[in-house]
Amino acid sequence: MIVGIGVDVVDIERFGRQLERTPGLRDRLFVPAERELNTRSLAARFAAKEAVAKVLGAPAGMNWQDCWIGLDHNGPTVQVKGTVLAVAEAKGVKRWHLSISHDGGIATATVLAEG
């Protein structure tokens, strides 16, 4: 059963400027393993996190570091803990599906939550 679908797009150049202007933003939005990635990859991961938030109804108090984007042999994966895991479990999410892409200066992500 599909619990929800979320989609988000991020302008890569604009996102890069935001990271430069706001020194703590990278640390607030990303786990240590993500922080060293290039701006294009960070924008795609942020789009994925936003898509996860949309699936969950953009819960108040969501900690951005409680959701991170990993990689396995099949591609990108959604990983959750803490605040995000609690809301996902309450909504019955058992499995995440994620597609991310970046082209033409835009990063996009689509997340499907399955229960």
Curated annotation (Swiss-Prot):
One of its GO terms (biological process) is fatty acid biosynthetic process. It is found in: Cytoplasm. InterPro entries: 4-PPantetheinyl_Trfase_dom, 4-PPantetheinyl_Trfase_dom_sf, ACPS, Ppantetheine-prot_Trfase_dom. GO terms for cellular component: cytoplasm. Keywords: Cytoplasm, Fatty acid biosynthesis, Fatty acid metabolism, Lipid biosynthesis, Lipid metabolism, Magnesium, Metal-binding, Transferase. Mg(2+) binds at D8, E50. This is Holo-[acyl-carrier-protein] synthase. It comes from Pseudarthrobacter chlorophenolicus (strain ATCC 700700 / DSM 12829 / CIP 107037 / JCM 12360 / KCTC 9906 / NCIMB 13794 / A6).
